[in-house]
């Protein structure tokens, strides 16, 4: 699978500069919007990508999509938090020979390892394509997480 032809990175956003108010985000530096706090968390992907630790009045959420893993600093940051629910990328499929179809996304096995390390109260696997879901129907999942 080839990545999109986007040499600039988010090039389409630069065409419509008046439609969005841009704010530079820095790793682990929270921003507040009303009663919500968003902390950018660096993720491993084909280009620099952030996940987010989101604090709401009622729960703490880890939102980790478009990732092939977490840098150690990100993992350690999140392990210090009480996470109510973790949404995590599981877009790569692992075939019966153990071959992963994407180097830019986690498999459900890799996502499970991160979930175990973070110990959230709940977890949801996200960023899954219909082809992966079809294949997963025949594979008993070794963990109690929701797809």
Regions found by a protein language model. Give the residues of each.
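Binuclear metal-dependent hydrolase catalytic cores
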Residues: 1-64, 68-76, 81, 130-147
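Cap/insert and terminal regions of metallo-dependent hydrolase folds
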Residues: 69-147
